[in-house]
Amino acid sequence: MFSNKKKVILVISISSLIFFLIFNQVKSQELRVIDGDTINLDGEKIRFTGIDTPELKQTCIKEGVKDPCGVTAKKILIEKIANNKVECINEGKDQYKRILAECFVNDKSLSSYLVRSGYAFAYRKYSKKFIKDEDYARLNKIGMWSMNFEYPWDFRRNN
């Protein structure tokens, strides 16, 4: 039915496929979103660099109605990373011993995404990297830019 040459090729092909499937499995990640700019990835607490999101207990006002903008920032991040592998570039540690990093999903910056969504701010005190993303959200009145809000750093200082 099959020549010896075809049998050998078939065995090699099947063996190669099995090898590929076994050794190219993506390592599963243990990932938990803490708030809009902090995650726990494989047991490490990671704070996104260059951005600041509203605190979880922080609210904004839109047309006289309170919006839980801190919770919304967290939800946006959860939705963006759901069922995706998160990769981070470590940039050091902060005073709270958190890893400072820029993190990505499908090679796209989560920080840039959050700022352009209007639920994170370019943290100019530490980086100028996301200013253009913030300008885009502000000019288009996206997210918090369509509301009355307090900057997260002011909220923390006042509360």
Residue ranges and their predicted role:
Residues 1-159:
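Small beta-barrel nucleic-acid-binding modules, primarily SNase/OB-fold domains
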